[in-house]
């Protein structure tokens, strides 16, 4: 009996099953979802005195040569010892105290060894998610990731359930639709203009004016985003000429 056709058919069925199970990224709107209003903040990092709204969150960021340089220095877990708590590896994070609801954030970015650069939105007074994380748009060398963290990966209820191995199906159901990944390709050493629009429960990312990521999810519509944070994983990532506008839905 020739079993080769059966094996081929089995492989095709298995592949089709996995393809059906893979989450499908949403269609990206071709036009902006947010309409710019007044400019809330601007920094080209060339001034002699840093704006007081910037602040350290996780080391290490510094201004050099008219650029904001981020380097992940908490790059490994350090176990608890001598009465000191465990320290987990974490991307470098720099905070900006500019409250928004709907907004457009634009910055120049460059990879110089970094594996990830992102723009995120938080509400420190919100206790339903870890550290008040609301949403973020991540740029990696091979993809763009859009995240609703309030109702997804940083949601405190979900994080508690993740500790119970019997709750995997429940967690997966709660996480469905809370993130989207889009293939992309970025070059180290090259400057890009990274734009993130937030309008209601929608978030759209663009690189050099071309839309590269989109997500519609309830957590993104969180009414109070008390601050914006810039993140860099790996070594090193640069930001330049950042601007933040208040905005309204373009529709």
Which positions does each model-derived feature cover?
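Beta-strand-rich interaction surfaces with strong enrichment in secreted/lumenal proteins
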Residues: 30-32, 91-97, 180-186, 228-229
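Bacterial N-terminal signal peptides that target proteins for export
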Residues: 1-7
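Short tryptophan-centered beta-strand motifs in secreted/extracellular beta-sheet-rich domains
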Residues: 45, 105-107, 189-199, 203-205
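Extracellular carbohydrate-recognition regions
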Residues: 22-58, 251
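Short, aromatic/His-centered strand-loop micro-motif at the edge of beta-sheets
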Residues: 155-193
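Secretory/extracellular carbohydrate-interaction modules
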Residues: 75-165
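Extracellular glycan-recognition surfaces and repeat-rich motifs
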Residues: 50-80
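Short, solvent-exposed beta-strand-to-loop segments that form ligand-recognition rims
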Residues: 208-227
């Amino acid at each position: 009996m020739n079993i080769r056709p059966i094996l081929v058919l089995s492989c095709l069925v298995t592949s089709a099953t996995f393809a059906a199970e893979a989450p499908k990224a949403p269609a990206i709107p071709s036009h902006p979802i947010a309409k710019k209003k007044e400019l809330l903040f601007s920094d080209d990092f060339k001034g002699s005195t840093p704006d007081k709204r910037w602040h350290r969150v996780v080391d290490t960021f510094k201004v050099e040569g008219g650029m904001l340089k981020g380097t992940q220095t908490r790059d490994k877990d350090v176990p608890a010892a001598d009465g000191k708590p465990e320290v987990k590896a974490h991307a470098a994070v720099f905070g900006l105290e500019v409250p928004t609801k709907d907004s457009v954030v634009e910055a120049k970015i460059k990879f110089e060894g970094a594996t990830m650069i992102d723009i995120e939105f938080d509400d420190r007074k919100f206790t339903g998610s870890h550290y008040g994380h609301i949403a973020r748009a991540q740029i990696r060398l091979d993809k763009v990731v859009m995240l609703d963290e309030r109702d997804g990966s940083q949601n405190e209820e979900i994080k508690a359930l993740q500790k119970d191995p019997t709750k995997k199906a429940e967690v997966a159901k709660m996480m469905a639709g809370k993130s989207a990944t889009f293939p992309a390709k970025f070059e180290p050493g090259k400057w890009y203009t990274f734009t993130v629009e937030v309008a209601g429960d929608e978030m759209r990312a663009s690189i050099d004016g071309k839309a590269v990521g989109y997500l519609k999810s309830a957590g993104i519509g969180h009414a109070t985003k008390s601050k914006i944070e810039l993140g860099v994983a790996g070594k090193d990532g640069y930001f330049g000429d950042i601007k933040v506008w208040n905005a309204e839905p373009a529709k």
